[in-house]
Amino acid sequence: VDTDSRTRPDRRPALAICVWNPDYPTWDLVEDLSGEPWSPPGARTQPIPGDTDSPALADRLIAALKDQDCAALLLIGRTSHPGPFRLQMRAENRRLDSAGRLDETGPGVARVTAPIAEMLRDLTAAGLPAIAASDAEEDAGSYILYRALADLPDSLNSPSIGLLRAPDGATEEAMRTAIKAVASAMARHLTPLPRSSAA
């Protein structure tokens, strides 16, 4: 019996993708006339626009992650280092524009929950130079990453959160390839939505 897939509930979890700085180029993931953004197998892309107001953007991203349909967040931005793409592995408890701790009661370091080793392997397989970096660059991306990680529930089903940094001079094609590689790696670890919540 043939079943029209368009009539079935979409059980793919959402993967939020955010280029946090609106001054960065917007790497367009809309590839055809449908107007729908590219989505990796097993997930559906939820684009979230960047904002120069980093605290407000962090609030919006945290709110998105609290939605039961959203299972992952990929932050995208620039690195201050020359050379390869960088997958940031941790964020420090640090204020955005001044010295001191952002959260007096929070952990000093928060580690990403995304599958870094697999993301790195997929970047390399796509022909892109890439490293996993333990240093937390002092910028809005690290601030937003810490905010999102520190707000995660202590649960086995916590969202997958990662941060991809591109070097200056990365081409639009390289950016699209990198985003697709890491998003696909993240999506492979996501669980389909329960039937009761699928739209």
PLM regions with names:
Residues G141:
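Polyanion-binding loop/helix "lid" in catalytic or ligand-binding cores
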Residues L145-H189:
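Active-site-adjacent mobile loop/cap segments within catalytic or ligand-binding domains
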